[in-house]
Amino acid sequence: MYAVIKTGGKQYRVQIGNKLKVETLPVEVGSDIQLDQVLMVADGEIVSTGAPLLDQAKVSATVISHGRHDKIRIFKMRRRKHYRKQQGHRQNYTEIQITGISA
């Protein structure tokens, strides 16, 4: 059984036991959360899709940790003009583990 959920402006395909890093959620480490923006649930041959969301479906998860991704470098340059600009960015994330899918 798997589901497609939407959180933080992105869509994720999840199964029970999966760990994934999503955009920062304002919750404590170790707490349980309910993700109710479920787009699709598949159980074997039975596939349920929403338009765009499924009303009764929920995905439950446990917050494992909060952290920051690796730094990415942004480098802008204009040729022949001696214009060079370098910038770094680290995005915050929340790591969750999927504990249940209810349709």
From Swiss-Prot:
PROSITE patterns: RIBOSOMAL_L21. Pfam families: Ribosomal_L21p (PF00829). GO terms for biological process: translation. The keyword Ribonucleoprotein applies. Belongs to the bacterial ribosomal protein bL21 family. This protein binds to 23S rRNA in the presence of protein L20. This is Large ribosomal subunit protein bL21. The gene is rplU.
